[in-house]
Amino acid sequence: MKMQKGNVLLMFGLLLHLEAATNSNETSTSANTGSSVISSGASTATNSGSSVTSSGVSTATISGSSVTSNGVSIVTNSEFHTTSSGISTATNSEFSTVSSGISIATNSESSTTSSGASTATNSESSTPSSGASTATNSDSSTTSSGASTATNSDSSTTSSEASTATNSESSTTSSGASTATNSESSTVSSRASTATNSESSTTSSGASTATNSESRTTSNGAGTATNSESSTTSSGASTATNSESSTPSSGAGTATNSESSTTSSGAGTATNSESSTVSSGISTVTNSESSTPSSGANTATNSESSTTSSGANTATNSDSSTTSSGASTATNSESSTTSSGASTATNSESSTTSSGASTATNSGSSTTSSGTSTATNSESSTVSSGASTATTSESSTTSSGASTATNSESSTVSSGASTATNSESSTTSSGANTATNSGSSVTSAGSGTAALTGMHTTSHSASTAVSEAKPGGSLVPWEIFLITLVSVVAAVGLFAGLFFCVRNSLSLRNTFNTAVYHPHGLNHGLGPGPGGNHGAPHRPRWSPNWFWRRPVSSIAMEMSGRNSGP
C-alpha cells in the first residue's frame, strides 16, 4: 500500500468523519496508523499514512504526509511535509513546504519556504520566497517573469509565461498553461493543466484531469481521479474508486476501494487513486498518486505530482509540474515550473521561468525571470528581468540583467550583466559581473570580476578579484595558456620576419651585381686587361651568397678581379 500524498490542507475535512482519530487540546501518539489528525495539540506519528497537526507540535517519522499549521513540525523520511507559520525540519523527505516560518530540509526532494528562512542540504529542489535561503548541493530551481524552454533539465520553473517541459523531473507554471509529460511533479496555477504519468499533479482555479498520477489535488473545481494514491476535492462532487480513503464535505462523493479521497464543495471523481484533492474546480485523476488542481483545468495521467492554479497544465509521466497563470508543457520532466510566462522543458530536472523567455536543454536547473534565458546542459540557470545564456552550468542566476554562464556551477546576476565561465558560484546584484572558474563571486550594486576565487563580495562599488583564496602570484590556467599562446605566436612571427628580410636583401644584392657587371664576351678571360688573369682559370672568392646557395657568376667575379687589379 502506497503512502498517502497530497492531503496537505484539505485533510482537515476528515475531522467531520473521523472523530475517533481526532484529539482536541491533547497529545496523540500513533504508530503504523493510516491517518492521524490532531487539532491544537501535540502529535507524534510513526510510519503513518497521514499526520496533520493544527496549532501544535507534530513529529512524523517515515510518514506518507505530515501537515502542521501554526506550530512546530519535525518529519523524518516522510513523503510529504508542510508547515504553515511555524518551524519545520525535514530529513530525507520527498517534499517539505514552509510558509511564514523556518524550514530545514536535508536530503529532501523538494523544499519550499515562503516568507521565512530555508536551509536545504543535498535537496533536489529548494525554493525560498521573501526570505533567506541556504542551499547546499541542491538540485534546484526558481524563476519569475519570462518564457522558458527547458530540455532534459533537472528542474524547470516558469512564472508569468507559457511553459513546456518534456522529460523533466519537476515542472511548475504560474499564470499560464502548462503541459507536462512523464514529469515527476506538475503544478499549474490560474489555468488548465493536463498531467500524464506524473508523480504529483496539483491544479488551482481550473479543471484538472490526472491519470495514473501518484497524488492529485484540485481546488475550486470538479475532480476525477482514477487509480490515484490520494484524491481530495473541495467545493464540489467527488467520485473515488478503489481509493484508500474518500471524504467529501459539502458535496457529492462516491468512493470505491480508494485509499484517500476528500471532496469539499466541488465535483471530484477518483478511481484507484491514493490521494486526490479537488477544491472548487474540475479534476480528473487516473492512476495518479497525488494531483491537486485549484480553480483551473488540470489533466494528469500517470503523474506523481501535478499542480495547476488558474492556468492550463498538461503533464505526462512527469514527477512534478507546476503552472500558475501561464502555459506550461512538461514531458518526462522531474520539475518544471512556469508562472505567467511561456516555458518549454524537455527531459529537464528543474527549469524555472517567470515573465521572460527561457530555453533550457539538458540543464539541471534553469530559471528565468522577466528576461530571456537559454540554458544547455546546465544544472541550474536562473534569469530575472534580463537575458541569460547558460551552457553546461550547474547554477546560473540573472536578475534584471544579461547573464552568460558556461560550465559554471552557480552564477547569479541581479540588475546587471554577468558572464560566468566554469565558475562554482557567481552572484551579481545591480552591476556587471564576470566570473571565471570562481568558487564564489557576489557583487551588489557594482561591477565585479572574479577568476577562480574562493569568495568574492562587492557592495555598492566596483571590485575586481583575481585568484582569491589562491597562493599569491599564481595564475589561472587559462591565463597561462593565453600567455603561452601569445609568446609562441610572437616568436614565430619574429623569426619568420627576420628570415624573409635577410633573404630578400641578399636576393636584391645578387640582382644588383649581375646588372652592374655586364658580360663583355665569351673570351673575356683571355684578353689583356688590368687585373686580368690572361687565360688562367679564375677561382671565385667566397661570397655571402654561397650561404643561400646563390653563387656569384664567374663573369661578375672576373670583373670584380679586374677592378681590384693594378
Curated annotation (Swiss-Prot):
Sequence repeats lie at residues 31-44, 45-59, 60-74, 75-89, 90-104, 105-119, 120-134, 135-149, 150-164, 165-179, 180-194, 195-209, 210-224, 225-239, 244-254, 255-269, 270-284, 285-299, 300-314, 315-329, 330-344, 345-359, 360-374, 375-389, 390-404, 405-419, 420-434, 435-449. The record marks 502-503 as: Cleavage. O-glycosylated. The keyword Cell cycle does not apply. It is a single-pass type I membrane protein. Keywords: Cell membrane, Glycoprotein, Membrane, Repeat, Signal, Transmembrane, Transmembrane helix. The keyword Cytoplasm does not apply. Could be considered as a marker for lung carcinomas. This is Mucin-21. The lineage of its organism: Eukaryota, Metazoa, Chordata, Craniata, Vertebrata.
